[in-house]
Amino acid sequence: IDVLISEDVIDTRIRELAAQIDADYAGKSVTLLCTLKGAVFFACELAKRITIPVFMEFIQTSSYVGTKSTGKVSMKLDVDDSAVKDKNIIIIEDVIDTGKTLSVVKEMMQARNPASLKVCSLLDKHECRTVPFEGDYIGFTIGDDFIVGYGLDVDQKYRNLPYIGIVR
């Protein structure tokens, strides 16, 4: 595994994203809707650095088996409508890849009438899009390498690496 983005660089970028969220939602609160399991590390670090009131909710979707996307999105864990309705929701994702999963999740959440709805992803593999989708807060734009660490895994391994690495 080769280091792609170091722990220090990730930390600096998360602080920048938190500052942007603070500015965008000054005087308000936000609900971070964390996608399990991959985005947990990112969501926790981001939440610690946001200074406005933060609430956290969790959802779990699945579209991968091993290193391959199945192309189908399934919701394994969802939240109550009351956790979304009239709230400032920021969906927290580890990586935007094809855009399919987040398109489905965003559509589902929008139907629950949030006050606002945005997406924050640590990583963006923009060249991999198969549907039009743009995140609102992006940590890093990267290529199509298969990556692990900082919450990202391959068959549940390497999630705990403190950096983002490329599997060779």
Where are these regions (language model features)?
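PRPP-associated nucleotide enzymes
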Residues: 1-168
